[in-house]
Amino acid sequence: MKKLVSLCLALAMLATIFAVPAFAAEDKPYAGVKLTYWVKLHENLDAAKVTNMAQTRWYEAVKEATGIEIEFIHPAAGQDGTEFNLLTAVPDEMPDIVEYSWTAYPGGASAAIDDEVIISLNDVIASGKAPHLKAILDNEVAIDKAVKTADGDYYVFPFLRGTTFEDNNCLFTSGFYMRGDILKELGLEVPETIDEWDAVLRAVKAAHPDMIPFITRTEWMNQIFTPGYDNYWDYYVEDGVVKNGLVEDSHFEYLKKMASWYADGLIDPDYLTHTKAGDGRGIMAAGNAFATYDACGGGASNIFPYLLEAGLISDESDMVTTVPVTSVKGQNAKFSKMNGLYDASGSSAAISKRLADEGGEKFEAAVYLLDWMYSDEGHMINCFGIEGESYNMVDGYPTFTDVVLHNPDGLNVAAALSLYARGHQNGPVVQDTRVNDQYYSYSAQVAGMKLWTKTDFGKYMYPAGAAIATDNADDFATITANIKTYKDEHEAKWITGQEELTEDAWNAYVAQMEAFGLSRAIQYKQAAYDAFMAN
């Protein structure tokens, strides 16, 4: 039944994405054309001992399907930002295609176009040369707006986490994990609301006084529990009005709860030191914590095996997950930690102005190649790899083979799949929920792919493409920096009890936020949102 539901959802998605005739791949109109493609080598490929994407079966499949040859250029590990800056400093020497997070370019994508680093794709799309991408843009207004600059320029062949917010597990990469065996021991249900979390953590503390009831990274602490108060930790949109949850009364209530949890030993006393990925994970893996919030892949795979090996849990099913914290049990959380459909922080592919100026067959081939990635054939190769090798069609459902799930060379699923596909990485692709349905092996991960979607945040998410006007950018940046510093300092003091959180203290805090210019920042965000929606 699960596969049938997933199949129906996937077919509906594919019908939307690929609502144009597929290219006749056998014609290969640009066979033999060679393109240069600058892209960061994904860490999963590094784990598979691959030094260039040309060594992958994915590339072999792309080359076979399109006839186009690609010379991949990879920046040195950890140097992609530096090398990107050097690359874009000399536009006349740019590779044909550059894959990067173009919102990170100084001044954003608009500046990259103005600086003649990349091109506006408006003419390409309007002329019908990118029919598969255009089909997505025509059918999905939110995506269409997100992948344009404030000036209305399309600028990338985007990395998309699906095309809808509904039942889309591609939008979630992390969630709660907890010891189900301890819940069973204490006769408790998996918590959903703040009150239920409070009861569970207190029961765990009483029964296991040497165990930390909850542990996670510093930055995630308020992102995962504020939704229990219908509060968001940043800018959001409600009925067309931009708001910021940091100064709402609901955030005050959240902070009071966190302060009580800290005082009563319910959260890690050293949580402020856990500032990067993996921090505190060892405590959970050693059985010294009851619950955590962590990455679906790296978190579970670095916690569950150690608990099993140490005999702290008898079966991996002893680890369980739950929905995003909600204010009303059984209802979707208003907010949650969730990615957008267009992940501007991920890398998407742009065509260099140099190549466009040269024109001719190479330029046409670059457009063809990148648009082909959104075709039915391109989608299947990007997400599943090669039929008969990395996956088989079973009752109409693309099912990964043991080459991916139980790799004979000992590669984990992420590394093995990286040899055949790109959909779980970045680039000009649309992710497919059917990948996540099979990608994870632990029952808590599989359940998380369903449970973590129980949120309505898609209705309130501030669009990533709504950029602050250039004239306001410096002032907005100053306000943002001041607010973040002040927020981090005071929230840490209140939660850890260094300062008492009273109504007077809270009111003074809100007043200082206003003095920093929060209302002005909200006005800037509102103007950007209005322009974005009107575009």
Residues of each region from the PLM?
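Extracytoplasmic/periplasmic substrate-binding proteins
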Residues: 41-54, 163-165, 169-177, 184-190, ...
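General small-molecule cofactor/ligand-binding pocket signal
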Residues: 69-75, 269-270, 320-325
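Flexible loop/turn segments at secondary-structure boundaries
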Residues: 43-47, 78-82, 104-109, 163-166, ...
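Helix-loop-helix "hinge/cap" segment bordering the ligand-binding cleft or interdomain interface
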Residues: 122-128, 152-154, 158-221, 236-295, ...
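Sec-dependent N-terminal signal peptides of Gram-positive bacterial secreted proteins and lipoproteins
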Residues: 4-23
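Conserved small-residue motifs centered on glycine
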Residues: 372, 376-496
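Conserved N-terminal structural module of periplasmic/extracytoplasmic solute-binding proteins
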Residues: 23-196, 227, 233-234, 242-244, ...
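Structured mid-domain segments that build the active-site/substrate or prosthetic-cofactor binding neighborhood
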Residues: 288-354, 358-415
